[in-house]
Amino acid sequence: MKFYQQYLDHLYQQVPVGDPLQQFARGYEDYLQCPLQPLMDNLESQTYEVFEKDPVKYSEYEKAIKAALMDLVKEEELDKKELVLIVVGAGRGPLVRAALRASEASRRKIRVFAVEKNPNAVITLQQQQLEMWGDLVTVVSSDMRDWNPPEEDYADILVSELLGSFGDNELSPECLDGAQKFLKPGGISIPYSYTSYIGPLQSSKLYNEVRNCKDETKHPLANFETPYVVHFQVNEKFLHHR
């Protein structure tokens, strides 16, 4: 029996750990979650921490910011030109850190404004500004739609991550419309655009979970018309991406 257990332990240790996305999403497979509403609610620190573990997103943001910096500042302007980069909805600062890394990698000078309405996240930003960022970053405690910087602080690059899970569920256009006023003519918005895709699939597990969600104050079918955030694992897709 001892050898049998040792063999099972050996097999378990040989199980592939999965790619970074699989590791990040472990424990959330086929689990119904309500979409977040960060404009209406102030997110908790634990929620930000989950976001910041995304293994792909911030790396891609860093690449995009670096490309924008190199496009706006030519080699002969390295010592003369300093760009203003504004992060709207800065959270606890992952995009600020990505911007500073991109600045260092591209050798382009930037001044960063981190605009955040959540007072809890602002405290974290201010602490990082005090301990690490110094004069490179200015923390602004304000709703991006209400902030009115002086014209000399208008953005050459405007960065946001209000992408949401699907469509406009985090009110990205509504928020960014108010922030467009401090983007310079010819400035760059990251992301420039994004697209949501929809396709049919079948999942017996999720169907039964939704069916078991009962609320006496709602119509019996209301839960079937409610949006959920799900990391799919056991399902059958009827239309594959081309």
Task: Name every feature range the model reports, one short phrase each.
Residues 1-57, 63, 72-83, 88, ...:
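Class I SAM-binding transferase module
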Residues 67:
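Pre-Walker A adenine-sensing motif
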Residues 92:
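Conserved SAM/SAH-binding loop
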Residues 99:
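Aromatic pocket-lining residues of Rossmann-like dinucleotide-binding sites
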